[in-house]
Amino acid sequence: ELGPHGDTKPEQITADGVVICAGVGSRALAAMLGDRINIYPVKGYSITVNLDDDASQQAAPWVSLMDDPVKIVSSRLAPDRLRVAGTAEFNGYNYDIRADRIEPLVTWVRREMPRVNTSAAVPWAGLRPMLPDLMPKVGAGKRSGVFYNTGHGHLGWTLAAATAETITAIITARLPV
């Protein structure tokens, strides 16, 4: 049974295998299983611009954009929503949203898309599970039946399907079906 702070009724579950894919929580789970995975939370910021008027909806691009020099990306989520993301911050497990990290995102939209109204922008911050070499941990752990698919960092959505296929192939090769 899960509550707002995790398990409220611990129970033992028997399984042939387990895949640890718990984002920044993977480090602690790996340690409990005898593995060391050097995942560190890297906070990423974004804004969702609610495109509440016709001019904003027409001005916002439908294709994803990447402004490499300033490390900002944008993606149209729906006819009335635009996501703009960028910046990275090493600050432990802190989820606080800093205005000085959001301001460059809003400023970028105003500069690059001057007809988009940013007054309804909603800020967000999340912790990206990063490894020092920026490569996800995809493979078996020390214990039999323990596998990892974690540490995708800022490329989580980009790599998720490919690493899921990879870990599936590894598991099916090692565990009886």
Q: What is the role of each PLM region?
A:
Residues 1-4, 151:
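Short beta-strand segments that buttress and anchor functional surface loops
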Residues 5-6, 78, 162:
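Short, ordered coil/turn segments that flank beta-strands lining enzyme active or ligand-binding pockets
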